Structures are given as C-alpha cells and as structure tokens.
Amino acid sequence: MEFGSPELMAVAMARLLRDGELVFNGVGSILPMLAIELARRLHAPNLIYLNIGGGIDARPETLPFSSTDPALLAGTAGIVDQVEFYQLVMRGGVDTMFMGAVQIDPAARTNSSVIGDVQRPTVRLPGGGGAAVVLPAARRVILWRTKHDRRAFVEKLDFVTAAGNVERVVTPLCVMKRVKGRLAVERLHPGVTAEAVRENTGFPIEVPAGCPETPPPTAEELSVIREFDPRNYRSLDFQ
C-alpha cells in the first residue's frame, strides 16, 4: 500500500505513545488526533485522550476537521474546563503532549508568537496559548512540523514562546530526540539522507553513523488511517 509524509508522520507519532498514558493535543492538531486514534486501536488500548476542548476519551467515528469539533465532546467520559486542565497539568497529570511550533531551535525551544523584532514584527503569529505553562509541566512533549526547512529550524528564535520537556520532534524528514539538551536525529525516514536533513536544518545537527530508518507504515496501520480519515484531512497541513 502506498503512503506519503502524512501517513508516515502519523505512524511515527503514534508509535511514540504508550499504553496507559494520558495524552493531550493542542489546537490545529489533525495529525496528533490521527496518531492518538492509531495508537489506541493498535497498541495502546488503555491510553486516555484529553483534547483541547476538554473532552476525555472522545471516540469520534472519523477524524474531525478541527481539534475543537463538537464530535470531540459528544459521548466523552467527562469534560474538564480550562481551570481544571491547567491544574491537572501543574500536578503532573499529563504524560505526553503534542505541540506544534513555527520555529524550533537546537534546544527544542519554540516560537509561535512573532517573526522579526518583537517590537516591530514582520509577522504576528497566533501565539502559544498555554504552551509556556504546559511545556515545562507535561511529563514529555512531542513537537511536530509538516515542513522541515531552515525557516523552521533556526539557530536562534525570533522570540521564545515556550521551553520545556520536549523529548522528540517529528517532521517529514526524520524523528529527532533531545540528547543532553540538544536535538539530534534519532531516525531518518525512508529515502531521506543525512545530507538532506543537514541541508534543511538551520543549525548543525548530529546524525549518527548508521542512523536507523523509520520503519514504513504496516498494512494494518494504513488501513486504520484510511478508515478513520476517509476525507484525507491528514494531508491539509502539507499543502
């Protein structure tokens, strides 16, 4: 079965999730929602999913278009408000969190606030929401980007929106892991070379000799993806 970056990234993210974890995703998180469902169906049936709307263990029939879709509240085990959510995070109750970012630096700090001088920005971005609070409080954070280039992976952020317990970064080229406070390539995706990653990263990044390749999606994984996302929403962030 054929696959592309959307399927490969969703699978790579899903495989990082563990059974029994409480997992949260932020706003605009189509791929994380797909990864969470994939993990629940195939290897983590006891995973607890808390979405940005406050729904606990939502079970939508198909992948919603938005991470705030009403389908993520219907039939849930419960709904928590924002105060309860932040209290949960600060108590260490969130095991894994998915978060996106516009810029990522070598230490896996993120910028989702501005491009350019903060006093006179070239671009004003949506902002980090609660990222500054939850990144250092969640037990581990998985960052994801659907474009891997020198504009995204920069030596110095234009603004530090959030920093914290980032464990891995998943992109269309590779999976990175933070080692001794700095990002390094853990796995190269099929067909991607170390040179391609270095050329598209705006800071020196370690790619170990004999770096393993991300195993391609299995037929079972692809079947679940296509059943849960028949409208191919997973491709929207790659356009």
Model-derived regions, located:
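N-terminal active-site beta-alpha-beta segment that forms phosphate/nucleotide-binding
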Residues: 1-75
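N-terminal charge/polar-biased segments
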Residues: 1-11, 15, 211-239
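Alpha-helix boundary/capping detector
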Residues: 51, 134, 223-227
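Conserved phosphate- and dinucleotide-binding cores of soluble alpha/beta proteins
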Residues: 62-220
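Short secondary-structure junctions and interdomain/linker hinges
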Residues: 20, 204-208, 232-236
